[in-house]
Amino acid sequence: MDLITTTAELASVCARLANYPVVTVDTEFLRETTYYPLLCVVQMASPDEAVVVDALAEGIDLKPFFDLMSNERVLKVFHAARQDIEIVWHQAGIIPHPIFDTQVAAMVLGYGDSIAYDALVERVNGHRPDKTHRFTDWSRRPLTKDQLEYAVADVTHLRDVFAALDADLKKRGRGDWVSEEMEVLTSPKTYDFHPERAWERLKTRVRKPKDLAVMMEVAAWREQEAQSRNIPRSRVLKDDAVGDIAIHAPATPERLATLRSLPKGFEKSQWGADIVAAVQRGLARDPRELPKIEKPRNNTNGAATVELLKVLLRMTSERHAVASKVIATVDDLERIAADDAADVGALRGWRRELFGEAALALKHGQLALAIEKGRVVRVERS
């Protein structure tokens, strides 16, 4: 195992790795106090070598690494790739491609919902890796021997995991299922956090166009502020405060001061003035230009349908040995219960064939569920 600290060393190792069809990759980073993750360490391995790159080494240029990430001839294997890809996207403006995410593959093969890396390694080769340094401060220097051994183990074990999952996918004919998921993971839309769409990630739900307009403006302001200062969104304004502001629409500092979700005196700060301005912009928006607010889907009949769909989903998951989470979410089920043409993953591609068609049949009485010998079974109805 080599520790790479110079651009020349990195260029040399990336040139060697580019000759292999598959390279395993992992990153270590910090983001507790920043909006954008701080890349600290990069680990890579081929069948013949493994390296750790000090991404914070003085003078190092990571361009050779980024070039390898965009090399179409090399498959990059990650576990839970989203945050690793986000880092590369932010620092270099590229999306690693092609990629293979072992966590997604494991879900497709029935290893459970979002299985952790150490648990997956243990399932594959019987050895549970040491995760002592999982929460270490990777920005501190020098890196210790234990840290380096921990870091390199992540990509060496990943070689075995990939080989096992890839073989199983081919045996069961599910390679295309994983490829479909990789298209989502490698789409720039997944990582392009435009401030005007920040409201979509909030769990707060509003029912009035006015509330939605205010929430959109306040969430966009918060996103811009967090990005420009490189601090977490919650350091600017917590999610519950955004929802509170959306509902009460405080268009003056005095009204803002009445909200309990904000600290005392907040209305006198520059951020307080910015929020009041955002509220005023929201109130001035034309309701006809706003996204359509979804009607609540929690009526009695709809709720009963969702519960039946949950049973069908569990049956499908067990029958085909696929994690239920990768087939459909609860939100998918609620949308299907409300609309046959819902734009959800469960009604597209392999998911529709595996589950979606049966879900619609169950909803319309063409399929029933019954209990036989203590087990729930599907009953086709004419």
From Swiss-Prot:
Catalytic reactions on record: Exonucleolytic cleavage that removes extra residues from the 3'-terminus of tRNA to produce 5'-mononucleotides
InterPro entries from the UniProt entry: 3'-5'_exonuclease_dom (IPR002562), HRDC-like_sf (IPR010997), HRDC_dom (IPR002121), HRDC_dom_sf (IPR044876), RNase_D (IPR006292), RNase_D-like (IPR051086), RNaseH-like_sf (IPR012337), RNaseH_sf (IPR036397)
Gene Ontology cellular-component terms listed: cytoplasm
GO function terms (MF aspect): 3'-5' exonuclease activity; nucleic acid binding; nucleotide binding; ribonuclease D activity
Entries under Pfam families matching the protein: DNA_pol_A_exo1, HRDC
Enzyme class: hydrolase
Compartments in which it is found: Cytoplasm
Keywords per UniProt: Cytoplasm, Exonuclease, Hydrolase, Nuclease, tRNA processing
GO BP terms, alphabetized: tRNA 3'-end processing
Cofactor: a divalent metal cation
EC id: 3.1.13.5
Domain HRDC: 208-289
Ranges in coiled-coil conformation: none
Domain spans labelled 3'-5' exonuclease: 4-169
Family per record: Belongs to the RNase D family.
NCBIfam families assigned: rnd
Biological role: Exonuclease involved in the 3' processing of various precursor tRNAs. Initiates hydrolysis at the 3'-terminus of an RNA molecule and releases 5'-mononucleotides.
Protein name, as recorded: Ribonuclease D
Organism: Nitrobacter hamburgensis (strain DSM 10229 / NCIMB 13809 / X14)
Gene this chain is encoded by: rnd
